[in-house]
Amino acid sequence: MVLFGADGRYLFVWADVEARMKKNYNMHCMPMVVLLNLGEDALVVRRQGYEGVPQNTGLPEWLTDGERGKVMRTLIKHGLIVDPASHVHSKNNLLVEDGRIQGLTAEEPEADVILDAEGMVVSPGFVDIHMHEDPYDPEEGRLIPSIMTSMLRMGVTTAIGGNCGINTVSPLRYLELMDRDGGPINMGLLAGHTFLREQAGHRDKYSAIRPDEQQRLSRLVKEALEAGCFGVSFGIRYVPGVTRDEMVKTACFCQSHGRLVATHVRDDADNVFDAVEELVSIGRQLDLPGQVSHVGSMGGFGQMERLLALIDRYRASGMELSGDCYPYDAFSTRIGETTYDEGFLERYCTQYSAIEICEGMYKGQRCTERLFHELRQTAPDTLTVCHVMKAEDVALALSHPAIMLASDGLMDRGQGHPRGAGAFPRLLCRYVAAGKMNLDDAVAKMSAMPAQKLGLTRKGTLRKGADADIVIFDMDRIRDCATFEHPDRPPEGIEWVLIGGKIAVEHGTVKQSSLGRAIRA
């Protein structure tokens, strides 16, 4: 005997029902065919033990372990629910079922898992719109999670890599690996212009692209967008040979797909205004939304007030323009990048000693002129931190209504800038707890704003039907613990993190590290 049971897009096929009807089949049935995915684009059948079907079957995460067929219910009780997208700020209970938010309730219904959030804040899982994804190991054929784990520990449940024009591997391959293996958090990508430019055959960052290379680049960008990338990212500061024409011919594919253009603009400090104008002019020409990447490190040298006023004027004229910022007054990049080309000391009004080495035999040391030039020649990929930004400019950016929080996290085997492990709790403890920002605005900058910018309607909110990606934190204890000496040290005060309704972090400890999946535009 076979029983069919529909659940939205999924059709479950159960066998051996007669032997089990004495019990609740939702709790005990073993599926012969796990499911038929009746989504808009595909029909996928997955059988127990059949290796011929691809690993990615569109399964909701709650169906991927020994609880197949069981309706999982989680109750988060007595917490302060903060959901800016729904204008909710109240003490209540939150019910989760089958990986989705079922709603708020004053009751305490029975549940498989009950989390007591008394005295804590319950918010949507944080969304990081600007980070740099983990590397790919070609020998093992898998991703090497490092920064994704740090993200999870600080409450990030969804992040976007591929920023500043950089991908670590083909976007198509990366998303396939996330589908196959999962990861600590949900991951989406931007198509990195610089990466794809090199794949198209042009590796000289100081020269213009040739017409045949532009054709190959255009094809690669189109393929990446069709595969689900959320838009195109540019790192023009790192590739000064890129012309405005190349940017237009690359970004134009976002127009037909309705995607985002995120840009590490061409210049910073006193030249940042013309650089932002370039992004805006392209956005207007193509009618595309723009995102100014890490505004703190672009105008955080005394130009921030004027830069934010410029952004306001563009927005008032109808341009969809926003930005992101991390709550630190030091930026990070590799020592061989164009950021450190001749003239940088004068541009930042600084000295070589402002540069701190993040890895290798000189880790923790400040640069001298000799060491700087030695590493530029012999180890150009060495990660550095440059302590040159003005704290007051960073604070000004973070308080602006069009600027959302992002980590710009970049790590190499746990080494790098502490923002990759501390940016989100740092905003809570150093801005909210310190009275510089209200809680709702901070949570919005960490969840609703980036989710809305990306078009992720089921992320960044706790409304009914949303994905149950949730972070529960203690405002009395929340603090970032990552330092420049120990950049991957996890924060305190993050009590639980749920992804798809399942507990990924409990009392600061990672319990499940593969609940995340690829997300696509």
Predicted stretch roles:
Residues 82-93, 384-388, 438-443, 451-488:
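Acidic, glycine-enriched loop/beta-strand segments at the rims
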